[in-house]
Amino acid sequence: EILSGLVGSEMCIRDRLNEQLRVNDLTHNTSTHFIAADVRGLFGTVFNDFGSHFVCKDTNGEQPLDSMIVSVTHDEEGLVTTIDEKRHGLQDGDYVTFTEVQGMSELNGIEPRRVTVKGPYTFTIGDTRSFGEYRGGGIFKQVKMPEILNFKSLRESQQAPEFLFSDFAKIDRSMILHIGFEALSAYEEKNGHSPRPRNADDANALLALARDIMQSRNQLPEGEEATKLSNWILTELSYQATGDLSPMVAFIGGFVAQEVLKACSGKFHPLMQHMYADVLEALPKDVPNLPESEFSPQQSRYDGQIAVFGKTFQARIGNTRQFLVGSGALGCEMLKNWSMMG
């Protein structure tokens, strides 16, 4: 009832899954776009639900293509040939219309025709047998057609997620992290706090919750290597649950900001629907050998970073002196990250 009259976007940032589900149950069948995001140390996640009937007016934001044509066949599948100095650039499923065609004048201003690409200079546009004979000239122009996107609710998507892979070298990690973030939320709901940095007992408790979820969905890892990878990622997620890194927040925050603009404008294809990212390669190799006390909170503004890298690493960062050449947009962002990292 609260959201039924609203049109806009609702964002859940670092809320527990139960709260996300509650809000999304309200937004899914209204005109309210829902985005959830979370960053835990070197891990990040984003989820979109723009409703069951979201109109994307322009999927890529590029200028419509156009080119001169040199022939159109009189056929069940009329074949259009463009000038050979320039590839037409179309893809299957694109739509085109025509102007300045001589002879086959029915094409001029015709309702957009769906394209099937046959080559870099040829494509078909459907039946042209009822048209006049082509005599010459003509220009095709691509028409951007609205695309209707059907988003699943968060409750439905938790059971059968659709992923955007942020790193094709880590395709096998998305499902692990999907279950891991759900288990992390369950842990926090049960215990009232996040797992402690580098605490083995808390990590084992989160692993047990994750295994229960995997078992209930028949998604247990198969084989020793897959099990080892899953356990390592889930353990690191537990260890870094209180982590808060400025560069990761900038990355996920920038991604979410773009999704908000897509939701409001209907321009550019939005995320469908989950995205998980990790940069565990940034973790120093000696971190697993350090004691838990190295990562304990110091009651400082850098506790979120200490939880991931340790206080010795933080002290090293604090004593580093960097020289940055240039202070444009990227330079300013770099300075911001450096200053927030200490």
Predicted feature residues:
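ADP-ribose/adenylate-binding Rossmann-like module
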Residues: 20-45
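N-terminal charged helix/coil linker that caps or initiates catalytic domains
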Residues: 217-221, 229-236, 266-322, 340-341
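Hydrophobic/small residue at the entry helix of a nucleotide-binding pocket
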Residues: 330-331
